[in-house]
Amino acid sequence: MHKFNLFLFAAVLLFANFSAQADGWRPASGHEQMQIWPGAVPDAIPRPKPESVGPPSGREWWPRVNDVSRPTMTFYVPKGRNTGVTVVVFPGGGYRFLAMDLEGTEVCDWLTSRGITCVLLKYRVPGSGPWWDGENRRRVYPKVQTALQDAQRTLGLLRQHAAQWHIDPHKIGVIGFSAGGHLVAAVSTHFAHRTYPPVDAADRESCRPDFAIAIYPGHLWAHEDEDRATRDETHLDLRPDIRVTADTPPTFLLQAGDDDVDGVEQSLAYYVALHKAGVPVEMHLYAQGGHGFGLRPGKLPIAQWPQLLETWLGTTVTGLKQ
């Protein structure tokens, strides 16, 4: 059966109640977007506005997706050889919006060109994870991280239907950028139990990623909100809600030293915790690069990071090495 027809059949069979929001984000033609929750979304928060796609604003050079209340996943099948490997993509946006192209579809284009199935998760925003309240100069930590629920659910669905979707249930990883990098760490350390009441058989499947990639992650360093004098005297402690163990999946980290949104301490704190726990971890730090560069080409050395990731994937995930 043709790959697209296979995904379409699975979508109709499993998510017959799906209907796209007229003004919300839609994938390009040929890609199937599916709701991940068959009925009511757990811990749903009423949104005063419908989902929308906004134009770039300020210094941002990419559009944003706002007010997501019905999370979805979109499949991007491999171009050419199917390695069986799958990567779920978590776009960034500070848990306030989603950078669905810069840190979403463009990432999927790169992954699928390397024989990897890509699943782009449109998780709930805003307020679905830790976020910075600029008006009141404070970081807000919601009681329930609904983005984590969406990530756990997606990994369970992929494993439940791995045979139908031609993916290896033991080669499912995650990649996230900025707030999405925090979501990578969250789902990598919160897989023993679901953070929502189980819905169906998919929630009996493991939601542990087999490998993880966090690119300029945020909300990981325990001391990021302290004053400068205190921060300079503190250690690289990880936030207590990110509990690294020896079972945390192998991880790839990347950050720039001049990142003025999420300081380099974010990756350093996570690296130290992973290293102490004996988790295989590779970290790349560059002097320059800033924040929010995605995979777009540039003149700085950090623009070559996808090559480093490709090498790491080839040595970490069996079957990817050409």
Briefly describe each language-model feature range:
Residues 101-119:
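Short amphipathic alpha-helix adjacent to the substrate-entry channel of hydrolases
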Residues 23-81:
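N-terminal cap/lid segment of alpha/beta-hydrolase-fold proteins
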Residues 149-236, 240, 246:
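Primarily recognizes the serine-hydrolase "nucleophile elbow" in alpha/beta-hydrolase
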Residues 83-92:
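Short beta-strand element of the alpha/beta-hydrolase
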Residues 91-96, 257:
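Active-site glycine-rich loops that stabilize anionic/oxyanionic intermediates
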Residues 264, 268-322:
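C-terminal catalytic histidine-bearing segment of alpha/beta-hydrolase fold enzymes
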Residues 253-255, 259:
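Short beta-strand/loop motif that positions the catalytic acidic residue
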Residues 94-103, 120-146, 188-192, 196, ...:
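Cap/lid segment of the alpha/beta-hydrolase catalytic domain
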